[in-house]
A protein has these predicted regions:
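A residue-level detector for the "anchor" residue at the start of short, highly conserved motifs
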Residues: 1-177
């Protein structure tokens, strides 16, 4: 098969032939066959967010390091921070995470994250805060500032700390890209 490979030089959105949107972080790459619409498979290196276009009777697969995600039409994010740490976060819809070496399958629900180590095939599922994601943006409405900081720390693997005392808990309404 002939492949098309897209390498993100900066954060960018790429639209696949089936209208699926992929928001790629700088340095990430995806590849797929020229006959993509016949078999919807993508191979990912790096971090990307997928908004999969739903096609009745047609699955969508994303291959990562010794595992793959099977999708039916949904929004999810994949972070591959190093050779030992892969994270898949489901925002809405339903996906199935598959470990190739063990055959383990995890059906994910919205607001769940699977952490996967491809070196030993270990998986861990945890619930994350309810996050609204649309068109490349995380959207918040009257979210308490402490909760917003916790979400930002999860998403961007940062360590922001809120200091000071407030008589009233500040909140945030807006979007973060």
């Amino acid at each position: 098969d002939e492949f098309i490979k897209v390498i993100a030089q900066q954060n960018q959105m790429h639209v696949l032939p089936d209208s699926t949107k992929v928001w790629m972080e700088s340095g990430s790459s995806i590849k797929y066959t020229k006959a993509f619409n016949k078999k919807r498979e993508v191979w990912l290196e790096g971090n990307s967010f997928f908004e999969v276009y739903k096609h009745e009777g047609s699955f969508f697969q994303v291959h990562i390091n010794k595992a793959f995600i099977e999708v039916k039409g949904t929004c999810f994010q994949i972070k591959q921070t190093n050779a030992e740490k892969n994270e898949i976060t489901l925002f809405h819809g339903k996906i199935e995470f598959n470990v190739e070496s063990t055959g383990e399958k995890i059906i994910m629900s919205p607001s769940q994250k699977v952490m996967y180590n491809p070196n030993n095939a270990q998986t861990l599922v945890e619930n994350v805060m309810d996050i609204n994601w649309k068109d490349g943006r995380y959207n918040f409405k009257e979210t308490p500032l402490s909760q917003l900081i916790s979400i930002v720390n999860q998403i961007y693997q940062s360590n922001i700390i809120l200091e000071g005392k407030f008589t009233k808990q500040p909140s945030f309404t807006g979007s973060i890209r």
